[in-house]
Amino acid sequence: MRRRSTVILSLAVLLTILAGGASAQIPTKGNVFFGYSYNRAEIVSNDATNLNGWDASLEGKFAPWIGLVADVDGTYGSHISEHNALFGPRVSVSVGSVRPFAELLIGAAHIGIDHGPSDTSFVNAAGGGLDYRVAGPVAVRGQLDWIHTRFFSNSQNDLRFSTGIVLHF
C-alpha cells in the first residue's frame, strides 16, 4: 500500500511539473489583424496582375520581441484568384505608440483561373510592417511582403501590401 501511495504521489508531482512547463509555452500576448490586401502578382514571367482582397493574421508572443504568426489571405482579379496560408516567426519591438516588425513565413499557395487551370505551390515570404497604436489595444497596420511561389512550374515573385486594424491582447 505504501508503495502504491508513493507511485501515485510521484505521478502527481510529475504531472504538476509538466503542466507548469506546458503552460509556460502558451502565448500570453499577441494580436489579431484583419484588413485590405493588394497583391502585385506575377503569374507569367514579366506579366503582372493587380489583385485586391483581404488579409488576416494571428500572432502569439513567446517572448517580448518574438512570436509565431499564422497569416492567410485571398486576393482576386477579373479572372483569377490567389490564396496563401503562411506560418512562421515574427520579431518586433514596441517603441512608444509604434511597433515595427519583420517576418519570415512559409506555407502553401493556391491559384485559380476562371475556366482554366489551377495550381497549388509551396510559398515562402519575407517582409515587415508597422503597427501604430490608436487607442488602448487598437492599432492600424501597414505591411509589405515579398512572396515567392512556383505556380505551373514557373517562379513568381509577388509584392503584397496590406493595411487594416490590429487588436493587441
Residue ranges and their predicted role:
Residues 41-44, 111-114, 149-151:
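A short, acidic/glycine-rich surface segment
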